[in-house]
Amino acid sequence: MSFQELLNQVGSLGRFQILQIVFLLLLNAIVVPHIAMENFTAAIPNHRCWVPILDNDTASDNGSRILSQDDLLRISIPLDSNLRPEKCRRFAQPQWHLLHLNGTFSNVSEPDTEPCVDGWVYDRSNFLSTIVTEWDLVCESQALNSVTKFSFMIGLFIGGIICGHLSDRLGRKFILTCALLQFAITETCVAFAPSFFIYCSLRFLAGLSVEPILVNSHLLMLEWTSPKFLTMMAALLSCAPNIGYMISAGLAFLFRIWHHLQLTMSVPIFFFLILTRWLSESARWLIVTNKPQKGLKELRKVAHMNGMKNSGDLTMEIVRTSMKAELEAAKTKPSLRDLFHTSILRKRICVLSFMRLFFTVSIFGLAVHLQHLSSNIILLQFLISALAILVSVIGPFVLNHIGRRITYLVLMSLRGIFILIAVFVPQEMQTLRIIMATLAEGISSLCVGVSRLHTNELLPTTLRATAVGVIGFFGNSGSFLSPLFMLLATYYANMPWIFYGGFSIFNAFTVFLLPETKNQPLPDSTHDVGNDWKESRKGKKEDPIIKVTRF
């Protein structure tokens, strides 16, 4: 509110904001793809049991060398219900009589088969090595593949709980730097994990630091930016991760061994860690947390970088006068209880938490299971990211013209419809199913950007990170619950996707329980969220008319 006047004085979108936003966007572009990294590093290739007569070069039982690979496969591996080689069982003894049967007959009694006691043979045409091939996470151990995703999401969940409160107490920049250090170390160490348990433990620690990085980078952009540029920032926030996803798809194509891909994606984070020393702490946060001297120092630094010649005129008296109400409020330390102190803020927290839960179940449910949509995960990820960038380009125009609520309604509804169409399209129409799923995932990033922007605009600065942490608690609950919905596929193959699509459509209409925030100033205190903020918003709308009349 009154901080906006100070921001205008030092430059609301100058050289400082551009450099800081570019850095934080690049940081998002390199961190976010790690959330779905296991689409590549944990890809499940086609596989079958290892059998001596087929895979041991020294074997020559019964003159098998004169038989083709297809014949050897036929007598060694039983067929499943789709007449494809079984992935998890083999014949206990070669079934020579099958060579004389028509290919449509595959009646083999259960006692003639056994599990893959000698291991598996993997199709390495897409990836030379993944954690699945390294630790044999297939057949009876296939559930462990979900454990890797679950461990990362649990880390994300816990990180979301603790990050908000720490950010409001210790500052955006400090928590961001600490989290980035932890993320860089753990994700680099993942590449050298000697066992599955250590791998999951490191992924848990990495997940623990993701939410503090994303939340605080968004807050540092938000709290240094004028409201009229927030829609542009939301679009850029949607584009940045997808540029990262496109790069990760390209790197996955170049580095087919998961250790190398993991290192290539993780080591550059240390470079960004070094650059965080030049980040500026949020002056808005410093002032409203009763640190006006430090806030003034940051404002003067920004004014100097933006080339504002009157930066020396900015004094402590001006800051205290402009932010008098906020400084008075800052004398009392905000607590978690303050989130529910007023009925309006309480309602917003509850609605946003409810929405975020269903939102993340649907978003992550689709994002981390892309391999179910296509065998060529690299190409699919690249196409989805390219589409998401194109969709994000129109984001600012849509947000500026029709606002946050209508944009969110349209995007989430379309996303849910695309998912449901993909579900009910016949299996034979695979191309259409992939197109629908690609469209659904393509608009997901803009949905995330709009959701984060609208959420931050509804919360006061003094409690923003804490509130985002509470909302993130429910959101991250959805993130680790989303893989569990895939267990429903054992009862009905399309059931998980029906839930993902239905949640998206349901979530779209709950946005009308929240107010529109287009062209409105950010609230700085809980007082601004109440009726006084509504009056100030009304006054802001009337100001231009008053000025024109006086002129």
From Swiss-Prot:
Coiled coil: none
Transmembrane segment boundaries: 16-36, 146-166, 174-194, 204-224, 235-255, 259-279, 349-369, 377-397, 406-426, 433-453, 468-488, 495-515
Any one GO cellular component localisation term in the record: plasma membrane
Glycosylated residue positions: N39, N56, N62, N102, N107
InterPro entries (alphabetical): MFS_dom, MFS_sugar_transport-like, MFS_trans_sf
Tissue specificity remark: Expressed in proximal kidney tubules, and in liver hepatocytes (at protein level).
Matches recorded under Gene3D superfamilies: MFS general substrate transporter like domains
PROSITE patterns, per database record: MFS
Cytoplasmic topological domain: 1-15, 167-173, 225-234, 280-348, 398-405, 454-467, 516-551
Protein name: Solute carrier family 22 member 27
Organism placement in taxonomy: Eukaryota, Metazoa, Chordata, Craniata, Vertebrata
